Amino acid sequence: MSFAPVYNAHSRALILGTWPSPKSREMAFYYGHPQNRFWPMLAALTREAVPAREDIEAKKQIILRHGLALWDTLERCTITGASDASIRDVVPNDIAGLLAKAPIEAVFCNGAAAYRIYTKLSLIHI
């Protein structure tokens, strides 16, 4: 199962990944691999301090303070390691349900696989 989405009533942009990596699943939160550049990049864009790797609450607060939402395109899948190329047996997350709950105006896919899955399976266009 994927992680719960991070969003609130002020979320205007949704960032979609594909599926949590093994390190992210180990940490129980998005982009948990120490070499992943997501959190340093987001901190630079928002002029926030880079949150500690283990500080899940600080990461959630950066997302929410800046009107963002964070989720993955897949609820379940079969995957070998962290290779998006090996993904099969996909079950998409209910992205339409999330969009009905929050005033999302834009969706940004964090990679080619997330974009391909979002456009193929969700059939949602903002």
Regions found by a protein language model. Name each.
Residues 124-126:
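Conserved small/polar residues in nucleotide/adenosyl-binding loops
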